[in-house]
Amino acid sequence: THPGAKLNFMGNEIGQFIEWRYYESIQWFLTEEYETHKHHQAFIKALNHLYTAEPALYERGYTDDGFTWIDADNSKQSIVSFVRQGEDIDDDLVILINFDPASYESFRVGVPREGDWDVIFDSDRPEFGGSGYAGEEPYTCSSEPYPWNGQMDSIEIKVPGLAGVVLKRRGPSSYKPPVVEE
C-alpha cells in the first residue's frame, strides 16, 4: 500500500522455498501440498485485486499528494497509519499496519473525513493463514467528532497483531452521540 510500483519476484506469489531458477518452473505443487503456500497465494491474489480495484493505490503513486501520514511515530504500539489519495476524494484509503504481535480490541486512529469506514482488506483473515482476530466478516467503523492524530475525526478499530488493515469511506457517519440525561 506504500506509494510506487510493486515488484514481486517469480515464485514469491506462492512463498516458494527456493529462489526461482531459470532452468526450472515455479514449484506450483507447493500450493497443493502445503496449506501455508496456499494461504500465501490467496493473500497475493487478494493484494493484486485490491491494488487494481482501488485507484488511490495507483493514481498518485509517484506524487506527494498521493500519500499522507496519519501517525508515523507510534513506537509504543508499533502501528503506522497513513492515507493513500486518489484523484477522487471518495477513493481515499486509510491504512494501518501493526508491526507488533499484540492485537488491539479498540485502537483509535484519526481519519481524514467523517464517515462510515469499511474494512476492505485485513491481512489477518483466515484464508490468508491469519487468526481472524477481527472476525470473519468485513465490518464498518463509524467516525466520531473526536480529534486524534491531527485529524478532526477518528474511529476505533480492531487491529490484529502483525497485520495490515485497509479502510475506505462508504458514506456519512452513522455515529450517534450518547444521550446525556439530566
Task: Walk through the language-model features, giving the residues of each.
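Carbohydrate-interacting/catalytic domains
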Residues: 1-8, 12-182
